[in-house]
């Protein structure tokens, strides 16, 4: 099996982007190619058809390669959950929660075995594996326990690309410093350098590139210009780079930027809608009166629920609802909508019960049992009979409170044909569900947006549209076209 490795001088250099592009380019050339990331730390996750959990970026890369995502493409997934701890997922299954120090003491050998086992499985099925590193391969305090970068490249004898983000400045120093900190046998694997996110006149780089090639004896394979192509970010730091409302188009939807926000790739399909403006709102910000507010998934529901209360955002949400606003909670956000979140085993906090937002007559019980599965269901709202697919990733069950006394009776109906997946209130202003990937469903997404548009007196949009995967396919081709145009990949490609 031919191996290609993509490492970066820093986080957010463009490793995922270029790995994805290479997968699509090779797939278009007829190669049977697979992505691979030995260990990924991310809160954006995807559920494979077998019920295993992997990083969402590896699922996107699998789609770029025109194959079905599998747990072998990301054998280790670490999901940060606060207090300097992470949930450890090996081959798709949660195996424990640990601190960084405990992880390397308890899971390093097991992790490397999982990585090599997955590589063996992929080697038996694919012609080419395109591996993605993590962070930097030259973190000298971490190299001895780095499971993701040059250890994998050396194991596979992979032709390796070093990517640098020039937009943040210091690109030449980053490249030289990274190469100087690699061992000679590691540096020998680097077959080329890619300069990413360049803005400006290309010729201004010529003298710098000539110097860099002479100094390092490694060719610069290309310079990728900055392009506004929709590509999912791996962690919430990417949300800081997003603009707020970018124009004055029809609908304004605010997504709360929870401290432990997860699976915010759920909202890429909304971002692709030209009539929608998304705003990721800090909890200390002013909510105002957008057309809808979304409370997204959370890796640590209780901590983020507490943050809603302590920042005053919970009160802003109450005022917003009283004024007729629309709220949608997904997964952890759904759990927060109820009256109480119970944590009997204190899995997330020091108490056994926490006050919810009290917007729906529901209660959630956090459990150690983790539900991870794909779903195919039918909708009841905003219209009945719409086919919906997605996936669940959550710990806990949410149920109606049997005896709920309030000044005004709140009537609920189930959102889908499976009552366990979500509810909507009678006025259709409070929506909650466990389903990730909900907005990938084109007809459901447009129907929900049309409901918001009708509230504003705006004309409806066509609902007979394809699911988001067709838009995603176009984006993947655009990414591949960009890299293919500006990067010479022949030195690392299979012959």
UniProtKB/Swiss-Prot annotation:
- Keyword tags: Cobalamin biosynthesis, Glutamine amidotransferase
Tell me the protein family, please. Answer: Belongs to the CobB/CobQ family. CobQ subfamily.
Listed name of the protein: Cobyric acid synthase
Concerning Pfam families, the annotation shows: CbiA, GATase_3
**Upper classification of the organism:** Bacteria, Bacillati, Cyanobacteriota, Cyanophyceae, Oscillatoriophycideae
Query: Which Gene3D superfamilies does the entry mention?
Result: 3.40.50.880, P-loop containing nucleotide triphosphate hydrolases
Please report the organism this UniProt entry assigns to the protein.
Answer: Rippkaea orientalis (strain PCC 8801 / RF-1) (Cyanothece sp. (strain PCC 8801))
PROSITE patterns in the record, alphabetically? GATASE_COBBQ
Lineage top rank: taxon: Bacteria
So where's the catalytic machinery, residue-wise?
331, 436
BP terms from Gene Ontology: cobalamin biosynthetic process
The task this protein performs is described as:
Catalyzes amidations at positions B, D, E, and G on adenosylcobyrinic A,C-diamide. NH(2) groups are provided by glutamine, and one molecule of ATP is hydrogenolyzed for each amidation.
> In which pathway is this protein known to take part?
Cofactor biosynthesis; adenosylcobalamin biosynthesis
What is the primary gene name for this protein? Answer: cobQ
Q: Which HAMAP family match?
A: CobQ
MF terms from GO for this chain are: ABC-type vitamin B12 transporter activity; catalytic activity
- Residues forming the GATase cobBQ-type domain are 250-444
